Design a protein with these regions (language model features):
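Bacterial Sec-dependent N-terminal signal peptides
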Residues: 1-25
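Sec-dependent signal peptide cleavage junction
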Residues: 17-37, 44, 129, 133-134, ...
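N-terminal, leucine/charged-rich tether regions that mediate assembly and partner docking
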Residues: 19-115
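Soluble oligomerization/assembly scaffold segments of membrane-associated complexes
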Residues: 91-177
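Soluble non-cytosolic domains of exported or imported proteins
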Residues: 41-45, 122, 142, 251
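Extended alpha-helical coiled-coil "stalk/arm" regions
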Residues: 161-222
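Structured segments of extracytoplasmic/periplasmic soluble domains
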Residues: 50-61, 134-138, 142, 182, ...
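Long, charged amphipathic alpha-helices with heptad-repeat/coiled-coil character
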Residues: 169, 215, 221-250, 257
């Protein structure tokens, strides 16, 4: 089931990754503002980090105004000498669609506080649409890289657990061989002790008592060895089952990791 959900997410993300920016409206302090917007198939926190990294890589420091992420003096169009303060609103699409985020970009006149009068004209809004489109690759690239990091961490964790199980398997096999050897030697010692008891004189009560005491000890050891062997063999059987399960989990997780890497490569 997890595999199919993961594949469905890849297909769904692929569809959304082709989405273009669009004109929308954003309500702030009971006023509706025209904004450029784009929808991306990633959680809000990841998208927020992606926007920050994108803008920082271009030399723009982040600021905050109310719920807006603000970057000052941003040239939204390379062919326009003007620059605007870029007000970003980054929110999840809905409570039922937490892995889809809407990025809204509102261009505000440089250095002015957000009010209806400070909003740039319609040409800046067109530039804002293009600016969001230019960010699409970075949004998807950054988000997929974060997924790859998380998935790689999961794969490494599974590999670590598999290594522990493998080492445990070796230790258990070694203990089983050791106790099988002890049990085989114990059997020989009991046979030898039986012969010694049979050859002893009936009148040698002291010698017989010691011989029987030694035999009792050998039989107690036999019981102990057999119990430990049963336990270790049961542990080894469980270990083998766990290793099979972990191998299956690893194969699935590693396939998901490779799928993510392919998605990243396909973006380029």
């Amino acid at each position: 089931m997890r595999k199919w959900i993961f594949l469905a997410l890849i297909l769904f993300s692929g569809i959304l990754s082709k989405a273009q920016s669009f004109n929308s409206h954003l309500t702030f302090q009971k006023t509706s503002y025209p904004v450029a917007a784009i929808q991306v198939p990633y959680p809000e926190d990841v998208v927020t980090s992606a926007v920050k990294e994108y803008m920082l890589s271009r030399g723009f420091a982040e600021a905050h105004y109310k719920d807006f992420l603000v970057f000052r003096s941003v040239p939204l169009d390379a062919g326009d000498s003007r620059s605007s303060d870029a007000y970003f609103s980054i929110v999840q699409k809905s409570h039922s669609e937490k892995d889809i985020t809407i990025i809204s970009l509102l261009p505000v006149k440089k250095g002015e506080t957000l009010t209806p009068a400070s909003v740039e004209d319609s040409s800046s809004l067109r530039f804002a649409l293009s600016y969001l489109d230019s960010m699409r690759y970075h949004m998807h690239s950054y988000s997929i890289k974060q997924q790859i990091l998380a998935q790689q961490k999961l794969v490494d964790k599974i590999k670590s657990k598999m290594l522990v199980l493998k080492n445990d398997s070796g230790d258990l096999a070694k203990k089983i061989r050791s106790y099988e050897s002890e049990l085989a030697q114990n059997k020989k010692d009991q046979e030898k002790q039986t012969r010694e008891i049979s050859s002893m004189s009936v009148g040698d009560e002291s010698g017989l008592a010691k011989a029987h005491k030694k035999m009792d000890k050998l039989m107690d050891d036999q019981t102990d060895y057999e119990k430990k062997l049963r336990n270790y063999k049961a542990e080894l059987e469980k270990n083998t089952e766990d290793r099979t399960t972990e191998q299956s989990i690893f194969d699935t997780a590693n396939s998901q990791l490779e799928a993510l890497k392919k998605r990243l490569a396909d973006l380029k």
